[in-house]
Amino acid sequence: MSARFCKIAMDLRAFAYLPSRLPFVSVTDGTLTPMATGYLRYPDVHGDLVVFTADDDVWLVPVTGGRASRLTNDHVMVRNPRFSPNGTKIAWTSYLGQRPEVFVIDLATGDQRRLTWLGAARSFVVGWQDDEHVVFSSPHQTNDVGLAWLYTVSLDGHVERLGYGPGMDLAVSSDGAVAVVTPNSGDCSRWKRYRGGTAAQIWLRPARAEKF
């Protein structure tokens, strides 16, 4: 059984993945709980909740399964929903304005806001730097749509480029270690097992170190 879009909860107690068309949630004792049928993508886990995309909207469901709640009602392409570290907000990429932009929702109030107005051909939410800043990847400051850089956008819409160079994904551990994935030449169907010069690379910087 193959798996795609794997995401591990921050407390390491659970992870979600999509084997073919049926998404499962696995807890650390190995129990697999089927969530629902349908074309579901991009799961992310926080505590006892899983967020995912389906039917051109963002949905929320308990880790234990049950009725999923639709968080958006826009019926446009969405991808990469990500919980904030404290679990109170979710950021995602939405094509509501024809171009991919960063949106955020407050789970307590249901308030949904658009954070970026960049107009780039590609722009994908990566995660959160902290509870106030969303990390995303975008080529909006280059003339090459395939050359994306990593940015943060604050909850009031202020965008800053991170100093890691070109990148499409980022992970920062609690002790400050950093992993950056450089842009690749296309989707995985084109670069799977590819070892040429345009293959993506993973750069690692240990905690308290200055160089990758």
Residue spans of the language-model regions?
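A short helix->beta-strand "capping" segment at the edge of beta-propeller domains
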Residues: F24-G38, A68
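Beta-strand-rich domains and repeat architectures in extracellular enzymes and scaffolds
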Residues: L32-V61, R79-N80
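Conserved beta-strand position repeated across blades of beta-propeller domains
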Residues: D44, R82, V126-G127, A171
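Short coil/turn segments that connect the beta-strands within blades of beta-propeller domains
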Residues: G47-D48, N86-T88, D131-H133, D175-A177
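A flexible loop/linker signature enriched in serine peptidases of the S9 family
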Residues: T53-W59, N73-V78, T93-F103, D111, ...
